[in-house]
């Protein structure tokens, strides 16, 4: 094996470029590791603060909990068919949320407004079971379910955090296309502390989530910048190789 490796011939760009490429690749590794660590850290604290036993440790051993199914505390709806062509032909300010999970689930923006206020959406197909908290004017595609809290004992933000943990557990993998239907969502059972405690926990998690998202959003931007730097050096190397090849021809 050592003999084979010894015979391998490698071409190297100038040392300065080697060092720059190595530095960029090291940065990729570090940024990717930090991205994973931030997401793990957030998930750990979210799960800890939403655990019933931990809530009692923090707020008192005698804190009561009430258990409800989603259908008992929410109006459950589904979005409508909104095509990309419709979005192109009806541009506006109101987002259309779909089964996408990138860009906050936003497919585009139109003039229409099907929902206005505090809601929860979830993806019903594809990347099913991904939950988002919404507050404002928006629309939802047919691959997006919509919840509106109707019980005054429930904090919408708190419910959204609970569902981010629980909803993925109820996703059905049918013919390699995961689904979380309205019917299944309606039957999910959740336990809630008093409203005042829900609001305190939701405020903590919302602030922490925003902080983590701000940090996480900055990391891909840094990675993209490093990719552009790497592309620059690759182009520089290959243009020189092409130049030398022409001279040798």
UniProtKB/Swiss-Prot annotation:
One of its GO terms (biological process) is DNA restriction-modification system. InterPro entries: Restrct_endonuc_typeI_TRD, Restrct_endonuc_typeI_TRD_sf, Type-I_RE_S_subunit. GO terms for molecular function: DNA binding. Keywords: DNA-binding, Restriction system. Induction: Detected at low levels after 6 and 96 hours growth, there are fewer copies at 96 hours (at protein level). CDD domains: RMtype1_S_Fco49512ORF2615P-TRD2-CR2_like. Contains two DNA recognition domains, each specifying recognition of one of the two defined components of the target sequence. The specificity (S) subunit of a type I methyltransferase (MTase); this subunit dictates DNA sequence specificity. The single R subunit has multiple frameshifts and is probably not expressed. The methyltransferase is composed of M and S polypeptides. Belongs to the type-I restriction system S methylase family. This is Putative type I specificity subunit S.MpnORF615P. It comes from Mycoplasma pneumoniae (strain ATCC 29342 / M129 / Subtype 1). The lineage of its organism: Bacteria, Bacillati, Mycoplasmatota, Mycoplasmoidales, Mycoplasmoidaceae.
């Amino acid at each position: 094996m050592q003999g084979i490796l010894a015979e391998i011939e490698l071409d190297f760009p100038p040392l300065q470029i080697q060092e720059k490429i190595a530095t960029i690749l090291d940065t990729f590794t570090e940024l990717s590791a930090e991205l994973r660590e931030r997401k793990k850290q957030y998930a750990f604290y979210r799960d800890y603060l939403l655990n019933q036993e931990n809530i009692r440790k923090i707020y008192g051993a005698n804190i009561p909990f009430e258990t409800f199914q989603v259908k008992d505390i929410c109006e459950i709806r589904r979005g409508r068919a909104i095509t990309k062509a419709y979005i192109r032909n009806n541009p506006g300010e109101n987002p259309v949320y779909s089964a996408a999970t990138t860009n906050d689930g936003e497919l585009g923006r139109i003039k229409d407004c099907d929902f206005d206020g505090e809601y929860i959406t979830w993806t019903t197909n594809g990347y099913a079971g991904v939950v988002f908290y919404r507050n404002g004017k928006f629309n939802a595609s047919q691959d997006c379910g919509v919840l509106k809290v109707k019980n005054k004992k429930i904090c919408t933000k708190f419910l959204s955090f609970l569902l981010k943990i629980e909803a993925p557990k109820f996703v059905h993998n049918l013919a390699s296309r995961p689904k979380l239907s309205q019917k299944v969502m309606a039957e999910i059972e959740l336990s809630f502390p008093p409203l005042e405690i829900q609001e305190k926990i939701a405020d903590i998690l919302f602030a922490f989530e925003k902080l983590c998202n701000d940090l996480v959003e900055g990391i891909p931007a840094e990675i993209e910048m490093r990719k552009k730097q790497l592309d620059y050096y690759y182009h520089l190397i290959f243009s020189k190789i092409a130049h030398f090849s022409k001279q040798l021809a």
